[in-house]
A protein has these predicted regions:
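ATP-binding/phosphotransfer module of carbohydrate and carboxylate kinases, centering on a glycine-rich
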Residues: 4-164
């Protein structure tokens, strides 16, 4: 949880990190901003065709073209990503964090911003000892993870059968 009693999440809880730093959440915040101020959201609405069609990808594309609303939304998402990651680094003290998924793939500078925020917000020993990198698996992480789990489960059965 990033914000107790915060934004509603797809998991039906509130305040989840994903509800602030996920791609779907970026799109939701953009749609809300465009509905509240259609003039500020004009570039997003035009790009998407309608307010309800605005997605995280729409925001990243508008950001790349210098849209001020998209810049504010992307900056906020980067901050949420970094703050949540700082909490993870404080709690687990990992040697490496690999960031992936649609938000990271849609806007690679998130990784640099996450590093900056972790360095500023996490406990010094943990922050100094962690490497934060972007995944090289792109959209294949889930498939590779599932295949790895299946292989490991098969190998476990195979090993057990040999030793029995």
């Amino acid at each position: 949880t990033l914000m107790p009693y915060g934004r509603s999440c797809r998991c039906r809880s509130r305040g989840c990190w994903e509800a602030y730093a996920g791609g779907w959440a970026l799109g939701e915040r953009a749609r809300q901003a465009a509905r509240t101020d259609p003039e500020a959201g004009a570039a997003l609405i035009e790009r998407a065709g309608a307010v309800e069609s605005i997605t995280g990808r729409t925001v990243h594309e508008a950001y790349d073209e210098g849209d001020p609303l998209a810049a504010r939304l992307v900056d906020a998402t980067a901050e949420y990503l970094g703050l949540g990651l700082a909490s993870v680094v404080n709690a687990l003290n990992p040697e490496r964090v690999v960031l992936g998924g649609g938000v990271i793939e849609g806007h690679p500078p998130y990784v640099d911003e996450a590093r900056r925020i972790v360095r500023a917000q996490a406990l010094r020993p943990a922050a100094d000892g962690v490497e934060i990198v972007a995944s090289e698996l792109e959209g294949r992480a889930g498939t590779i993870g599932a295949a790895t789990m299946a292989w490991a489960q098969h190998e476990g059965r195979h090993t057990t059968q040999e030793t029995a």
